[in-house]
UniProtKB/Swiss-Prot annotation:
Its main location: membrane. Keywords: ATP synthesis, ATP-binding, Cell membrane, CF(1), Hydrogen ion transport, Ion transport, Membrane, Nucleotide-binding, Translocase, Transport. The lineage of its organism: Bacteria, Bacillati, Bacillota, Bacilli, Lactobacillales. Pfam families: ATP-synt_ab, ATP-synt_ab_C, ATP-synt_ab_N. The keyword Coiled coil does not apply. Belongs to the ATPase alpha/beta chains family. F-type ATPases have 2 components, CF(1) - the catalytic core - and CF(0) - the membrane proton channel. CF(1) has five subunits: alpha(3), beta(3), gamma(1), delta(1), epsilon(1). CF(0) has three main subunits: a(1), b(2) and c(9-12). The alpha and beta chains form an alternating ring which encloses part of the gamma chain. CF(1) is attached to CF(0) by a central stalk formed by the gamma and epsilon chains, while a peripheral stalk is formed by the delta and b chains. ATP binds at residues 169-176. SUPFAM superfamilies: C-terminal domain of alpha and beta subunits of F1 ATP synthase, N-terminal domain of alpha and beta subunits of F1 ATP synthase, P-loop containing nucleoside triphosphate hydrolases. NCBIfam families: atpA (TIGR00962), PRK13343.1 (NF009884). It comes from Levilactobacillus brevis (strain ATCC 367 / BCRC 12310 / CIP 105137 / JCM 1170 / LMG 11437 / NCIMB 947 / NCTC 947). Signal peptide: none annotated. GO terms for molecular function: ADP binding; ATP binding; proton-transporting ATP synthase activity, rotational mechanism. This is ATP synthase subunit alpha.
Length: 513
């Protein structure tokens, strides 16, 4: 068998043509320090702020500090397997989390990994956790109401889609309960909810998820949780991960409600990281950019203009105060960033007024724009009535003789406080809120005993459902009060049937005789 030189030459040329240079160049560094959720590495001269790095043991880190000789890295996972001298390499990409419909109904960690035991999440969509907030021209005014189902909030501090409304108060005053009840009330409202639990005990998160499942709210909710046992970097990135998941829906024209519960713990985690990375401490030992940490997060909530799809993301950040001190550093920062605050008073809470909202210090900077017209009409004087009542109540304690007008205002105030009370997970549809507030402001409750007010409310709701469902439907569909005196006549009709407790007791006694 003879081998021709031409054939050998052709084979060599063919091999050369198909040859690919598969040499990959990776920039690597050496770990010089590791501990408390952070590491330092030398040799990563071209690393970028916020870039993901990969350690030898498969754990990722994120560049936080860029210094002359090394980089400071926050470790996104278990740092116990990383030792001094290990290799760390650049990935060339920034931190991303999975997004999309597949996450709805799931409980995930800040990396987007499922932790609810229901299997992996199959989605190939991701978004960076850090994203520039929509600009001024990309937004439109907040005008669409977000109904919380809580009478005191919908009447006094209304929230609109695209707004940032702070929930602030001492521990154990019902902050999380308001957020959870608001999520529950979004059923059938074309809203996707995201609950970000930052630094909350696993048992607490489990209880919250069980509550959401009980009311069918997990059908439209994503829960992102970073427990206290996890490294501080996980608590720090949790709200940004939740915001990225929400932005995916917002930019597709959908409406999102996101709860950050709570940002005090995120600030504490960021302070811990910054001090370990030897950043200069400022007021209360927080780093100088703690304001920017929260502002760049909360500014991502917006109502996009119609050209961008008209989607919205409404944020309810939660802040915990110490002894009601809203003038501390973090509370004042977040108050100045948000569009209003719901302040919960511990004294009111322990005296049985729940939700324990302080009408004097709570405010919504969007105001009546986020209310339906019917609610605006019936709740217009409510705040003034409450303020006057609080002022007169303290004056009346001195035992002075009061004229009839003052006594009438005190009586109206007592009944207003009673009407605004609401049990846990007892959401009220907006039409029913309008009906009971209409009855209150038109004097139908003035002659009732305070103890009868909530019974009157519940029986009125039942009566309207049974006999005047058309009036409720009219308020729901049009957003206006029914024409003419139809609502007034219906409530008067019910007044004639309602039996106050004293009369009911007398009737029962006569029947027994």
């Amino acid at each position: 068998m003879s081998i021709k030189a031409e054939e050998i030459s052709a084979l060599i040329k063919q091999q050369l043509e198909s040859y690919q240079d598969e040499i990959s160049v990776e920039e690597t560094g050496t770990v010089t320090y590791v501990g408390d959720g952070v590491a330092r590495a030398h040799g990563l001269n071209n690393a970028l702020q916020g870039e993901l790095l990969l350690f030898d043991n498969g754990v990722y880190g994120m560049v936080q500090n860029l210094e002359a000789s090394d980089v400071g890295i926050v470790i996104l996972g278990d740092f116990t397997g990383i030792t001094e001298g290990d290799t760390v390499k650049r990935t060339g990409r920034i931190m991303e989390v999975p997004v999309g419909d597949q996450l709805i109904g799931r409980v995930v960690n800040p990396l987007g990994q499922a932790i609810d035991g229901k299997g992996d999440i199959s989605t190939d969509k991701t978004r960076p956790i850090e994203h520039k907030a929509p600009g001024v021209m990309d937004r439109q005014g907040v005008s669409e109401p977000l109904q919380t189902g809580i009478k005191a909030i919908d009447a006094l501090v209304p929230i609109g889609r695209g707004q940032r409304e702070l929930i602030i108060g001492d521990r154990k005053t019902g902050k999380s309960s308001i957020a959870i009840d608001t999520i529950i009330n979004q059923k059938d409202q074309d809203m996707i909810c995201i609950y970000v639990a930052i630094g909350q005990k696993a048992s607490t998160v489990r209880a919250q998820v069980s509550t959401l499942e009980k009311f069918g709210a997990m059908d439209y909710t994503i829960v992102v949780t970073a427990s206290p046992s996890e490294p501080a970097p996980m608590l720090y990135i949790a709200p940004y991960a939740g915001a990225a998941m929400g932005e995916e829906f917002m930019h597709n024209g959908k409406h999102v409600l996101i709860v950050y519960d709570d940002l005090t713990k995120q600030a504490d985690a960021y302070r811990e990281l910054s001090l370990i990375l030897r950043r200069a401490p400022g007021r209360e030992a927080y780093p100088g950019d703690i304001f920017y940490t929260h502002s760049r997060l909360l500014e991502r909530a917006a109502k996009l203009n119609d050209e961008l799809g008209g989607g919205s993301m409404t944020a309810l950040p939660v802040i915990e105060t110490k002894a009601g001190d809203v003038s501390a550093y973090i509370p004042t920062n977040v108050i100045s960033i948000t569009d209003g605050q719901i302040f919960l008073n511990s004294d009111s809470f322990y005296s049985g007024v729940r939700p324990a909202m302080d009408a004097g210090t709570s405010v919504s900077r969007v105001g009546g724009d986020a209310q339906i017209k019917a609610m605006k009409k019936v709740a217009g004087t409510l705040r003034l009535d409450l303020s006057a009542y609080k002022e007169l109540e303290s004056f009346a304690q001195f035992g002075s003789d009061l004229d009839a007008a003052t006594q009438a205002r005190l009586a109206r105030g007592e009944r207003t406080v009673e009407v605004l009370k609401q049990g846990l997970h007892e959401s009220v549809p907006v039409a029913k809120e309008v009906i009971i507030l209409f009855a209150l402001t038109h004097g139908h409750l003035d002659k009732l005993e305070v103890a009868d007010v909530l019974r009157y409310q519940n029986e009125l709701f039942d009566y309207m459902d049974a006999s005047h469902k058309d009036l409720e439907d009219s308020i729901t569909t049009t957003g206006n009060l029914p024409e003419g005196n139809t609502l007034e006549d219906a409530i008067k009709e019910f007044d004639g049937m309602f039996q106050p407790t004293a009369k009911a007791d007398d009737t029962a006694a006569q029947t027994a005789d």
